[in-house]
Amino acid sequence: MINYKPFFDTLKRKGITQYKLETEYGLSKGTVDNMRHNRSITLYTVEELCKMLKCEPWDIFEIIVDKV
């Protein structure tokens, strides 16, 4: 399972609000909503987020392995 908690932690650490993401960085509300609910986003979006936030992919998401 992919979890986007690191993304929201990164935003907090950098002092970036959801409003700023949408207005200054052009990220859609739908993308933020998908991430808030741990739904999929494209690799292109991950790449763009890394460029915008000057961070690495692990600052955007983490993979949680389900125990069988």
Predicted features by range, described:
Residues 17, 42-45, 56:
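Residues that mark the N-terminal boundary/hinge immediately upstream of a DNA-recognition element
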Residues 19, 30, 58:
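Key DNA-contact positions within bacterial/archaeal DNA-binding proteins
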